[in-house]
């Protein structure tokens, strides 16, 4: 069995692993993987999630911190959806949109065996993007029979009427197995008029989009003789959503954005079992994500609609790899094992405006990689002694060569130490990196000429003009991070149902890509921006900016004269930001039997502290605990009780308040309660055999999100990255298995 976070079969990872199995998903009433990851305290709901609305771009995620197509992306530690790697059965998926997010909710949860999340840097194992960590969706391998199901639900305050239909079928034979599933989920929007704290916003502004999702998946495994196994994973999804943003009461029209995304994946692999317990693996993956946005302006008086913008963001990915894993020699704790491999990837991205026939970004990136990982079990069961019951060392290294920025090497060292059978201590140190997104590299560059006063200039002559450049930067380097993780797990033999783990983590994330000029109106003379402004431009420097620009805009009202250029403002993407992230995770669980059934108490919580510095001349500022950024404290605690065919669960979710950085006021915290009741008739051969009923209530007490003073009339008065406007949501589902 392969564990996420290591390529060693049956190996241990020195990093904590969060495992959420299909049974837990069912017990807690989750119906898609988006709901699952939003329940994980280590994950930030900002970035690409359906409830994120206008205004969230003020957070550290910038333009990536908004909802484009209704998907849900992992965003561990709030480092961004492009800094968490998402895998399906251990293999990469195509990026979605220009923010390089992967929509995990498009994978049908009915086919999922478990999701494993490693909230620790893992570039030494998986390469680029695994800075905040990695999430691996593992599909069910053996499924027998057919299950059909339906779910209906809605918010009691109005909106989000949901209709879901799914079918899953599978079979197992002596040498293999197959599972296939299809799901259709449609949901109505939540309008601002349906929530009293937002009903003064322009109608029909939406707080939560309406959507329609079709998703299908097939997974096959087949043994060929005794030494070869073939596996194929494939899925296809299509999601449509309607959003009504950016509308104010002062307008005579409103905007409608109709978005559609289509994702495809084909991922074959071959495992060859060699002599001496060695395994050779050959795998490939092809995936594509095409997202379109049609923005139209609707006249209120006449109802006529005119398309003002139509874009396509298309991502294509292809990869192949070959690897080997097996034992090297014997140690007192077991076999020392080695995993080695190499491969290549190619990603391509195009963002175009179909109305004008122009591209906003167009580029591709290829990379080559090689890796090695060692596991050295020095002491194990049967070979331990007083004070050392278990001792294992791990080491991994990976090298990648990218077309744009060249080579990068990421090592990782780990220790697993068990002083007694009741305690396990883990520690890891490693380097991670993230390649710049293709949008950051290849977005078109725009040059603009305007008066010095426009940029806040004082004392300039009447003819003085300022030349600015913004957009992509093909000379970007990789973002790099150093990560430390130390955890202590308590699993006493005297209480076999008790488990608890406490983790400390620290991330030093440098060379983050940002747009350095955030306030163009006060750029000139501001010491924070001095390193990005050339106050003595040469003719060569001016010509270089214009030669590299894809478009030039003259807003001075006068003919362009290079002699009038008094300064150049460089506002394109650049590697200058540094983030410091540290915190503590806690995850206890206790399972015990009662006369009335089995009770399981489990929970998870995190405390996060993070800051960011944009350039050496600028001061660091807080990220965690500020509006549109991760809250400092998040937690989820609850209980599951089961007796026979009946299961009930109740969980409390807590998110601490965040500070509005404009008026320095802190919002209230947000506490909700989720409950789920399940009843299964069991398999007894009758007409009611194989039925499963579930009633779920999210936000049982209908808590409204904490409010703040929104910066504009078209923004809702709450932080949509941390808090939800849905309110109480009731759903009922039924399924039957043959």
Which role fits each region the language model picked out?
Residues 46, 142-145, 158, 174-175, ...:
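Short loop/turn motifs that connect adjacent beta-strands in outer-membrane beta-barrel proteins
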Residues 72-75, 103-108, 129-150, 165:
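N-terminal periplasmic accessory domains that precede
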Residues 1-26, 34:
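Short, acidic, small-residue-rich periplasmic hinge/interaction motif at the N-terminus
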Residues 508-510, 609-612, 653, 657-659, ...:
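C-terminal beta-signal and adjacent terminal beta-strands/loops
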Residues 601-685, 701:
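C-terminal beta-barrel architecture of Gram-negative outer-membrane proteins
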Residues 144-147, 157-279, 284-286, 391-394:
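Transmembrane beta-barrel wall of Gram-negative outer-membrane proteins
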Residues 91-119:
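Short acidic/polar hinge/loop motifs at secondary-structure boundaries
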Residues 38-91:
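Extracytoplasmic beta-strand/coil segments of soluble accessory domains associated
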């Amino acid at each position: 069995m392969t564990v996420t976070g290591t390529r060693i079969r049956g190996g241990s990872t020195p990093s904590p692993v969060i495992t959420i199995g299909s049974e837990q998903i069912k017990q807690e009433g989750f119906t898609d993987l988006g709901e699952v990851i939003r329940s994980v305290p280590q994950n930030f709901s900002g970035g690409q999630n359906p409830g994120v609305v206008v205004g969230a771009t003020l957070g550290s995620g910038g333009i990536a911190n908004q909802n484009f197509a209704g998907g849900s992306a992992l965003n561990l530690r709030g480092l961004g959806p492009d800094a968490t790697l998402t895998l399906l059965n251990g293999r990469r998926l195509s990026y979605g949109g220009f923010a390089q997010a992967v929509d995990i909710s498009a994978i049908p949860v009915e086919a999922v065996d478990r999701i494993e999340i490693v909230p620790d840097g893992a570039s030494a194992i998986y390469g680029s993007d695994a800075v905040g960590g990695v999430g691996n969706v593992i599909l069910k391998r053996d499924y027998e029979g057919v299950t059909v199901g339906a779910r209906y639900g809605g918010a009691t305050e109005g909106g989000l009427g949901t209709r879901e239909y799914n079918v899953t079928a599978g079979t197992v034979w002596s040498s293999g197995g197959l599972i296939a599933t299809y799901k259709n989920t449609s949901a109505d929007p939540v309008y601002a008029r349906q929530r009293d704290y937002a009903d003064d916003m322009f109608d029909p502004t939406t707080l939560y989009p309406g959507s329609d999702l079709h998703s299908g998946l097939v997974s096959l495994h087949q043994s060929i003789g005794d030494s070869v196994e073939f596996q194929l994973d494939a899925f296809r999804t299509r999601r449509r959503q309607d959003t009504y943003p950016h509308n104010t009461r002062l307008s005579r029209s409103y905007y409608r954005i109709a978005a559609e995304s289509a994702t495809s994946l084909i991922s074959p692999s071959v495992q060859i079992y060699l002599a001496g317990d060695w395994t050779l693996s050959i795998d490939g993956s092809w995936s594509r994500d095409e997202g379109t946005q049609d923005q139209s302006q609707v006249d209120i008086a006449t109802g006529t609609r005119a398309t003002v913008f139509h874009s396509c963001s298309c991502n294509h990915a292809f990869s192949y790899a070959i690897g080997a894993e097996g034992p090297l020699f014997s140690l007192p704790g077991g076999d020392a094992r080695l995993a080695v491999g190499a491969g290549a990837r190619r990603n391509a991205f195009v963002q175009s405006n179909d109305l004008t026939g122009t591209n906003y970004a167009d580029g591709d990136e290829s990379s080559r990689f090689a890796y090695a990982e060692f596991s050295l079990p020095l002491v194990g069961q049967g070979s331990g002694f007083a004070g050392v019951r278990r001792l294992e060392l791990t080491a991994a290294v990976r090298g990648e060569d990218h077309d744009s920025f060249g080579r990068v090497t990421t090592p990782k060292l780990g220790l697993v130490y068990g002083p007694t059978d009741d305690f396990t201590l883990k520690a890891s140190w490693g380097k991670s990196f993230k390649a710049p997104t293709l949008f950051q590299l290849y977005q078109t560059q725009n040059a603009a000429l305007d008066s010095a006063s426009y940029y806040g200039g004082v004392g300039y002559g009447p003819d003085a003009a300022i030349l600015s450049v913004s957009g992509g930067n093909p000379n970007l380097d990789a973002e790099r991070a150093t990560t430390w993780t130390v955890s202590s797990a308590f699993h006493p033999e005297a209480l076999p149902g008790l488990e608890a783990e406490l983790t400390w983590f620290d991330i030093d994330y440098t060379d983050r890509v940002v747009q350095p000029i955030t306030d163009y109106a006060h750029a000139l003379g501001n010491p924070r921006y001095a390193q990005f402004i050339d106050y003595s431009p040469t003719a060569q420097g001016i010509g270089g900016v214009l030669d590299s620009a894809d478009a030039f805009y003259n807003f001075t009202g006068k003919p362009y004269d290079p002699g009038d250029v008094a300064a150049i403002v460089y506002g394109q993407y650049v590697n200058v930001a540094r983030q410091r992230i540290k915190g503590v995770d806690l995850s206890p669980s206790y399972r015990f039997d009662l006369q009335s059934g089995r009770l399981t108490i489990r929970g998870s919580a995190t405390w996060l502290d993070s800051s960011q510095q944009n350039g050496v001349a600028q001061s660091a500022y807080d990220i965690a605990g500020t509006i549109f950024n991760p809250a400092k404290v998040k937690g989820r605690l609850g209980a599951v009780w089961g007796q026979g065919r009946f299961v009930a669960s109740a969980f409390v979710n807590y998110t601490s308040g965040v500070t509005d950085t404009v008026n320095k006021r802190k919002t209230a915290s947000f506490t909700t309660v989720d409950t789920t009741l399940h009843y299964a008739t069991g398999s007894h051969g009758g007409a009611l055999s194989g039925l499963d009923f579930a009633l779920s209530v999210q936000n049982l007490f209908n808590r409204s999100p904490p409010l703040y003073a929104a910066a504009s009339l078209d923004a809702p008065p709450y932080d949509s990255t941390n808090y939800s406007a849905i309110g109480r949501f009731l759903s009922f589902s039924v399924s039957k298995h043959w």
